Amino acid sequence: MTAMKEDNAALITLKKNNDQEKLRVHKLTDASSNSADGFVINKAKNGGPLNKKSLVNNEQHIKKAVSPGRVRKHKTTTSSTKSRTKSKKKDASESKVQRENKGSFYQGAIFGSFLGAAVTTVLSNLAVKALQN
């Protein structure tokens, strides 16, 4: 039983050593790929640009590409007042007449509906009496 534990422990340490060696090799290859002709290329951790100014420009560019927002059309210039016909101002009496007409229309519609209901009830009562006789 103890022999199996020792074997397992030996396997685990071998795996750890192999993993560490792989990591060392990987780090060495990354370092060599970052340098070219003696110049070292600096990479940001997040993959973004190093400048704050270019970062702002980059964010604006991305924002425009993703959602341009509402596109507003340019308003056409209005013609001069001389060529336009001036609207006449309405008298106060004319506006009151229009309001009265509008109100009387609604009042007439309400009155007409009640009148129609009364007529139908009277006619239905007459028809019932005629059928009973």
Swiss-Prot record:
Effect of Y106H: In pmr3-7; leads to mislocalization and decreases nuclear fusion efficiency when temperature rises
Inducing factors: By pheromone. Expression is controlled by the STE12 transcription factor that binds to pheromone-response cis-elements (PREs) in the promoter of target genes.
Residues in compartment: Nuclear: 1-104
Membrane-traversing stretches: 105-127
Perinuclear space side: 128-133
UniProt KW Plastid keyword: no
Topology in the lipid bilayer: Single-pass membrane protein
GO CC aspect terms: cytoplasm; nuclear envelope; nuclear outer membrane; nuclear periphery; spindle pole body
Chain residue ranges for the region called Disordered: 36-100
Motif (Bipartite nuclear localization signal): 69-75
Subcellular location: Nucleus outer membrane; Cytoplasm, Cytoskeleton, Microtubule organizing center, Spindle pole body
Alphabetically ordered keywords of this record: Cytoplasm, Cytoskeleton, Membrane, Nucleus, Transmembrane, Transmembrane helix
GO biological process terms held by the UniProt record: karyogamy involved in conjugation with cellular fusion; nuclear membrane fusion involved in karyogamy
Result after altering G108S: In pmr3-1; decreases nuclear fusion efficiency
Residue ranges with Basic and acidic residues bias: 90-100
Main location: nucleus
Subunit details: Interacts with KAR5.
Function: Required for the fusion of nuclear envelopes during mating, ensuring proper karyogamy. Plays a role in the initiation of outer nuclear envelope fusion.
UniProt name for this protein: Pheromone-regulated membrane protein 3
